[in-house]
């Protein structure tokens, strides 16, 4: 007998709607038969005037849209953010303006590299994208379950993602592609170590941290700005899967994380995360020992402690996965007054790329879809028409300035000014202190057992690579810590002997 809410979805529908509805065509006309096509005689050919069939099949042929190029498979939920601590001295954003204030939100969790049918338990970062429906527009905080990323310059992003996808000839995942890229971009080491540690296999979506990852700016009502990073920590605790359990679930329940989230919410066991920020002044940023806008590095908590802000509660499942999750579109460019961008190059690159991919996947009016529209503030602009447009903004003028009472600006939401100097050039940053924080991760974050498990996790896929890639990666590991390189080397040699 089915026990979980996800198993009983159809039964629940039947109990909720006991009276069957008359079946119609897409234009609302009732039909008398849904079990046979229209033919000339019992054994004769179909007729082109079978509009019931044509209506059904034409829509079926167009049901799928392009899947996301990354983060293709995911789960979503609705909820709210509640302010529990006053941070108005740092930020004027409407969402934070009063303790106790609640703001509705949508979150989408996801794996990164796999296709939409891949296993939820793959060793992969997890997407952690939140859309806050604030009274001054939608704020999208598009992060991951890691505080760092593989690269610091966005020009590498397409090539990095190519290595996480399939070989274009064999159509197979290729460890040589993956590790060869990391061999040439050692700034990835910090994130790679995070990925191959126990944290690379979170136990579903409810038991993992979330991070904005990038550095942002917060601005208060007096126009004073500071730099900030966002953190989310689950009150239900962090849990990870063992390699063996993750492999078992990939076979027996590849939708494990989606199922776990849906059933928990449906049972009333609402997941909760506390939000924290780290704060760095402009003066501290100028003097800090490394580039504070480098997304391959963290801000040490001892120097920049976590400041509690509020809590995020997920309390409602989507009614329609396609409409509310598959068609949801998150974009780092979507900020609100009080939140601004930093010089983080990866953030700057994402400002363009996310909107661009939404145009490809959903069309130029994706922002008009109910799940994406800023329904608590409403959009007022001169953007009109295009595929699937239905909002003409009360037939207002589509040009500005004008003499017809349409449109005014708000001087109080002016971006803060900042100085910018330097020669225009392409500045290579591949050798910018790539080993110090990975070394701290090895020495201070991982215990003895976690180090051993991480080395074992590396040895399997790295051992399948060409010898020069193995040697190059072990050299990188040894620069992090001699014991790290030696352990992985010994494990790979042991694997090789066992295959003789």
UniProtKB/Swiss-Prot annotation:
InterPro entries: Catalase, Catalase_3, Catalase_AS, Catalase_clade1/3, Catalase_core, Catalase_haem_BS, Catalase_immune_responsive, Catalase_sf. Its main location: other. Keywords: Heme, Hydrogen peroxide, Iron, Metal-binding, Oxidoreductase, Peroxidase, Peroxisome. One of its GO terms (cellular component) is cytoplasm. Its cofactor is heme. It holds the Pfam family Catalase-rel. Optimum pH is 6. Its EC number is 1.11.1.6. Heme binds at residue 354. It is an enzyme of class 1 (oxidoreductase). The keyword Membrane does not apply. It is found in: Peroxisome. Induction: Up-regulated in response to Cu(2+). Up-regulated in response to phoxim (an organophosphorus insecticide) and carbaryl (a carbamate insecticide). A motif (Microbody targeting signal) lies at residues 498-500. Homotetramer. Belongs to the catalase family. This is Peroxisomal catalase 1. It comes from Caenorhabditis elegans. The gene is ctl-2.
